[in-house]
Amino acid sequence: MLRSMLTASTTLNQLQQQIDTISSNLSNSNTTGYKAKDTNFSELVRQQFDQVDEKNEEVAKARKTPPGLRLGVGAMMSSRLVSDQGSIQKTDRDLDIAFTSPYQYLQVNVNGNRQYTRDGALYVTPSAANANQLQLVTGNGYPVLDENGNTVNIDSSMKNITINKNGTLTASDGNAVQRFNLGVVQVNNPQELKSEGNNLFSIDNAAAFEELNGANRQNIGMQQGSLEMSNVDISEQMTDLITSQRSYQLNSRTITMGDQMLGLINSVR
């Protein structure tokens, strides 16, 4: 009984993590540029009990199954980032951009640290360093970086802003022109991305991404006046949620039954 209760308890913890992941996916189904996480389970190391007669050749030949008794000790959940391209929704807003390549991310400054996002809903806010300039930021107020790692500061006199498919922002007032190459990276291994919340990611392994500068900027796929929607499949997430809830109930029932059996043993006189 104790073994079954411990096994169920281990699995319950992993199932709760799966439910939390699914809940996060569903709550972000309308978040711009959000990438869903997929979950799966694998069996933990099994414990084997050998039998006394397992080395007996006659017994071994007569068996239809492998010798010994193998008992599981629970399951472990793992998750991976789903990097599939989300649908593109046209907004006709000059500061909205959508990546058309599934592995490219915009560089932003988060409290002095460089992080990455696919949320292309951008805004301008008065620059703290220069009253005559506007700073390009994300919806959460994080400064967008250019290809050199500097913030994008646009003169407040500029009225027209265009962003081409290679990530070059051009601002003009009819006479003067400013150009900025937005900082974009190509992620070679999306599983190296570490979620930091607020639709942001960090990367510890420098070999997992490549900065698209110089001639490589022609590989950037960006569309102005559009936003990439979340790639969450709601029907799939709801199906997984129901399945995980049923598994949670079954494992909870296992613990309850084990407790009842222990209670019966304690009541024996």
UniProtKB/Swiss-Prot annotation:
Record InterPro entries: Flag_bb_rod_N, Flagellar_basal_body_rod_CS, Flagellar_FlgE/F/G, Flg_bb/hook_C_dom, FlgE/F/G-like, LlgE_F_G-like_D1
Gene giving rise to this polypeptide: flhP
Coiled coil: 7-65
GO cellular-component term (any): bacterial-type flagellum
SUPFAM superfamilies: Flagellar hook protein flgE
Protein name as catalogued: Flagellar hook-basal body complex protein FlhP
Cited Pfam families: Flg_bb_rod, Flg_bbr_C, LlgE_F_G_D1
Keyword set, alphabetical order: Bacterial flagellum biogenesis, Coiled coil
Family classification: Belongs to the flagella basal body rod proteins family.
BP-aspect Gene Ontology terms: bacterial-type flagellum organization; bacterial-type flagellum-dependent swarming motility
